[in-house]
Amino acid sequence: MSYQLVVSEKPSVGAAYAKVLGATNRQDGYWEGNGYLVSWCVGHLVELAPPNVYDAKYTKWSIADLPILPQKWQYLVSASTKKQFGILQKLMHRPDVNSIVNSCDSGREGELIFRLVYQQAGCKKPFSRLWLSSMEESAIREGFAHLKPSTEYDALYNAALCRERADWMVGINASRLFSCLYGQPLAVGRVMTPVLAMTVVREAAIAAFTPEKFYTVALTLADGGTASSKRFAQKADAELLLSKCRKEGRITVQKMERKEKSESPPQLYDLTALQRDANRLLGFTAQQTLDYAQSLYEKRLITYPRTDSRFLTEDMAASLPGLVTDTGRAFAVEEPIPIHVQQVIDGSKVTDHHALLPTKSMAKADLAALPAGERNVVRLIVARLLCAVGEPHRYAETTLTTICAGEEFSAKGKVVLSEGWKTMERKMLGELIGKQKEPAVLPDVQEQSQCSVAGAELKEGQTSPPKHFTEDLLLHAMETASADSMPEGVERQGIGTPATRAATIEKLVQKGFLERKGTKKTKVLLPTDKGKALITVMPEEIQSPEMTADWETKLLQIERSEMEPETFMTEIKEMISSLVTTTEAAKGANALMKNKIIGVCPNCGKSVVEREKGWFCENRECRFVLWKDNAFFKRLSKRLDAHVADKLLRDGRVRLKDCKSAKGKTYNATVLLSCEADGRSKFSLEFEGGC
């Protein structure tokens, strides 16, 4: 009997495929049955080799050895996943396996993950591609019935290779260059550094902003409505006008203009739009939203989440009304739902995957059994579908231009003619969006008529600085970076992709370049002193959002066979070579780049400073360190963060609530810090309530 080997990206996805295919016999690292072997990759099994594999001299960081630009790229099997790679390699070489299916995630990274394993395993057998946008059983069966030739995705693989190798070259060379120049570890990334630069520039603009006061005169009309004057820089000028208006007591209607307007329904979600709304309305980080969406996808409740499209293809039009009705009922929408399918259909704007949708399975699922976060994300996706196919929100806007005391005053009013899609938005998301401000209604007056003034007052305001970046605003900035400077018609501008933006933000936070501050629902992302210092010494070509966005566009062109991979890689190598030969340490930067002191070493009394992987004693002879990735704190289901490190160094102890035992029980305890005989840190527990 011959077998077809199916290789997925994760065990959970592999299990779902195995169930549909009838491969029900569980083996070590794979499923077997019905002519199929179904296994998985556990993410990236094969990784780019570190520099020292190419040459032992690269073990030591030196500017003299830069740039490091491999001519023949080398790969290694990840140490933590060697067993699973061995299983896949053995399965690929089994004599009874005559073909393979790449069923890793349907995108750039999924293509790369499979192909690297295939090549590292030395496999030569033919393989085809499973390309799905839904994990529903019907979609899986349809996908396996219509497998695609692997050659259709060669260009996608080339783009993935270029992305991976460009990131490696920029990260390795720039990190070593700037670490050597400034005498401390500095992590630099092709995507990460421009995103950090955007936050630093924004905070600099806020710090440099000087608010300016202004004054207006507001007239309350006897028949309803309020008319406002222009802004005055001088309070005395506004007070003089106020006095004149009070004496005059009437306004003359110079012009009344009424226009009927409409607000189109919002587009369906792509991943970035979903992450933005989830942050704005629910306070979720981009990574949390992606994690929830991925889980919902694997539970067959939504379609593929890592999409950059906000439209559907023409062949989906016929089934959409049924999906809208069924998902509406799942959320207790009993009234008829207007369904205008054509406004969400445009196959020309669909790339790898269509817009995010709930599935038919979602309409039948027990949503109450879902974790709260997943339930909220599903609600957002369903609400967006019901709104997107709805009718326009129509209203009449009235603008009044009046004269009082020789000065022009204006007033605006609004009357809703048809709620349209906003009815569904309020029904689905009313608690999240809150009560909307009632629009002002103006009196029905004729031009050149006069109206009495019921009251007049002076109002003081001031100009506002730019807003701090929330994840919502930063995602938007990443998505639209360089859009103004890109040629018209270029499809993708921006930094990163929908699939990678969340990870970029998380990496900046984890490395201590960004920090989240604020309430649970409204947190802003602020650059730390370390982040500001890094950007201060970075040359323009490394921190430029425009250059990074240009690279993303070129990767898309490679994906579409519109650009040769070699051309892109040559450009990256030339930029790196130029960077290495022309960059010098910035004058006066040493003080700026100084490590942050957070306390005193309990072993030798010298200063303890923060670095990328922990808090280290400045005394090179001392072995004291508090590791950020700390095994002791992990056993308590806690993190050793800056606040905890500060408390430990200052008081020698820190009280922790809701620690977890190995059996899952919670307890409170105090962690005590001491030192071993050789100076290494040592932790112990002092219990309060028992375990």
Enumerate the language-model features and the residues they cover.
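Intrinsically disordered, low-complexity regulatory segments
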Residues: 1-164, 168, 438, 454, ...
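Amphipathic alpha-helical transducer elements in NTP-driven molecular machines
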Residues: 11-18, 35-38, 42, 78-89, ...
